[in-house]
Amino acid sequence: MNKRGALLSLLFLSASVSAFAASTESKSVKFPQCEGLDAAGIAASVKRDYQQNRIVRWADDQKKVGQADPVAWVNVQDVVGQNDKWTVPLTVRGKSADIHYQVIVDCKAGKAEYKPR
């Protein structure tokens, strides 16, 4: 009986660690054309990209926030960047929880990385 309990405990611990690791990994994605945009334009592009492209594909985000159409926003004053490389703090609010991302956008490369924060 003790072996079974220890095995179940180990299995549960392993699953918990895997779930935590999955939720803290960054996600690299293709990003639409954004060269020459200012901070407000980049903020709008990141918000639009998340709402139209990411939330529909990232089931773990839908599950965490508790809905398929959460509210996403960016405070433009917190957007920093130069030479078409930007750091954008994104907040996603749903029924169950909030998700916070630091989105690193490289306009020249056409890529973005969503890092949980």
Curated annotation (Swiss-Prot):
Main localization, broad class: secreted
InterPro entries reported for this sequence: Uncharacterised_YebF, YebF/Cmi_sf, YebF/ColM_immunity
GO cellular component, one term: extracellular region
Keyword line: Disulfide bond, Secreted, Signal
Domain YebF/Cmi per the UniProt entry, residue ranges: 30-117
Residues of the signal peptide: 1-21
Family, per entry: Belongs to the YebF family.
Protein name, as recorded: Protein YebF
